[in-house]
């Protein structure tokens, strides 16, 4: 997958041995990319991400920035979210979550990356 380099690969191997053994929701929560709600009183609909494995999330953030440029599938996903006036950080977090769930599925199913043809 474009955007996944040696730094991300080694980080995932070392700090996320559960990759490929969990569901997409579980792996997103484990990394800290699942939004949690803190609704109370007037604060409704505000979601944030927190917790999880910070070193994995930090490296995944930089990989997502690279993938938004060079991975055609994620580039289209990024532009689609930007067209709906999402905030830039929200878009990057969505790309991060898509990357980790895709990598999780690839390891679970033991398949190589196959870019979608246009």
Give residue spans per PLM region.
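Phosphate-backbone recognition surface of nucleic-acid-processing proteins
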Residues: 6-84, 88, 115
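Basic, amphipathic alpha-helical segments enriched in Lys/Arg and hydrophobic/aromatic residues
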Residues: 83-118
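Histidine-centered phosphotransfer motif of kinases
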Residues: 1
């Amino acid at each position: 997958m474009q955007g996944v380099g040696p730094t991300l690969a080694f980080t995932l191997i070392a700090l996320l041995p559960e990759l490929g053994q969990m569901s997409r929701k579980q792996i997103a929560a484990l990394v800290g990319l699942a939004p949690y709600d803190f609704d109370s009183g007037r604060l409704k609909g505000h979601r944030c991400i927190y917790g999880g494995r910070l070193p994995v999330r930090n490296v995944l953030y930089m990989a997502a920035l690279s993938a938004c440029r060079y991975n055609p599938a994620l580039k289209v996903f990024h532009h689609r979210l930007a067209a709906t006036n999402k905030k830039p950080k929200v878009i990057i977090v969505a790309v991060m979550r898509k990357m980790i769930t895709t990598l999780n599925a690839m390891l679970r199913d033991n398949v190589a990356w196959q870019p979608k043809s246009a």
